Amino acid sequence: MTMIRKFKLYQYSIPVDSQLILRNRFLKKREGLLVQVCCDDAQGWGEIAPLPEFSQETLEQAREQALAWLEEWSASDGSAGKLPLEHLFPSVAFGLSCALAEMKGLLHEEGNYQVAPLCYGDPDELYDPLNQMQGEKVAKIKVGMYEANRDGLIADMLLEAIPDLHLRLDANRSWTPSKAQMFAKYVKPEHRARIQFLEEPCKTPAESLQFAEETGIAIAWDETVRDAEFQQNPPHFFTPQVKAIVIKPTLVGSIQRCVELIKQAHAHGIQAVISSSIESSLGLTQLARLAQQYTPNTVPGLDTLDLMDYQVIRPWPSSTLPLIDLDSEYIVPIKLD
């Protein structure tokens, strides 16, 4: 029996919060692709959204590659086996793998929508959401954008004020060893255990590990997970100071690749945290479903929707942002030859 395969591709461009800075660049809008795949009566959606300054591929490159893959996929009837995703750009592999998994019923419906509230610098933003939070209290703070001693003081102040709070901190490799030490100096030793982890404090993994050994502050890998050295030998990076790896599927690749990383981390007793690359609500809800399916006991890092002015196609359960659909001026179908 011949299967009928079809696809549609759309491009979205949504205004975002004007304060959003990615590696010293203001991001005015978030752009990406929405893909729909259909096979007979089954269908699935995915999002392909390279993150400027972080992804290796541009949106144009991703669009070209996705179109070529989808055209080959739709022209085949599946008898020649699966079309591989591994050679594709990470954002393309992830978006296509989500669409295919949805279509085949392999991506579970239930999602983990508990978020770690994200703070870009003003700690007052965190008190209300944290005091209202049920269950485990986890918040995330971006550090490394201001003075290291200020970052240390803010972290210490929050831990002092909310005794059952655990913090995730993200430095994006921005500190020298001496600046990282300056941060630690302002966090009281009795509070350091409640820093769940500090992502990539220093410019190199070796410096970050040394910082963790000297201060007792646990660290997590984020950028390192995508480095060639890590991919060749992950266990080398799973030392006692490392408490988590952060997996951003848009930057890592297909669902299958992400699951491999999760299993490697769990085998070494290390948390795997599914995290956002500032996807639209469509991509974020799929990340929440992935998190529930593969890391059910870990709060994912998905608190980025409020940076956007709109939700796209599928709503995040608790969001009050307006929802746009395929008729919106912000979504354009990509014409197929």
Curated annotation (Swiss-Prot):
Keywords assigned by UniProt?
Answer: Lyase, Magnesium, Menaquinone biosynthesis, Metal-binding
Active site: residue positions: K142, K248
Domain of life the protein comes from: Bacteria
Q: Which GO terms describe its molecular function?
A: magnesium ion binding; O-succinylbenzoate synthase activity
| Catalytic reaction(s) noted | (1R,6R)-6-hydroxy-2-succinyl-cyclohexa-2,4-diene-1-carboxylate = 2-succinylbenzoate + H2O
Disulfide pairings: none
Pathway it works in = Quinol/quinone metabolism; 1,4-dihydroxy-2-naphthoate biosynthesis; 1,4-dihydroxy-2-naphthoate from chorismate: step 4/7; Quinol/quinone metabolism; menaquinone biosynthesis
Instruction: Output the CDD domains linked to this UniProt entry.
Output: OSBS
Show the Gene3D superfamilies listed in the entry.
Enolase-like C-terminal domain, Enolase-like, N-terminal domain
Q: Which InterPro entries match?
A: Enolase-like_C_sf, Enolase-like_N, Enolase_C-like, Mandelate_racemase_C, OSB_synthase_MenC1, OSBS_N
Q: Which residues are noted in the entry as Mg(2+)-binding?
A: D170, E199, D222
The EC number(s) given in the record are: 4.2.1.113
Example GO BP: menaquinone biosynthetic process
Q: What cofactor does this chain's UniProt record say it requires?
A: a divalent metal cation
Tell me the SUPFAM superfamilies matching this sequence: Enolase C-terminal domain-like, Enolase N-terminal domain-like
What functional role does this protein have? Converts 2-succinyl-6-hydroxy-2,4-cyclohexadiene-1-carboxylate (SHCHC) to 2-succinylbenzoate (OSB).
Q: Which family does it belong to?
A: Belongs to the mandelate racemase/muconate lactonizing enzyme family. MenC type 1 subfamily.
Q: What is this protein called?
A: o-succinylbenzoate synthase
Q: Which organism is it from?
A: Pasteurella multocida (strain Pm70)
Lineage start: Bacteria, Pseudomonadati, Pseudomonadota, Gammaproteobacteria, Pasteurellales
Gene expressing this chain: menC
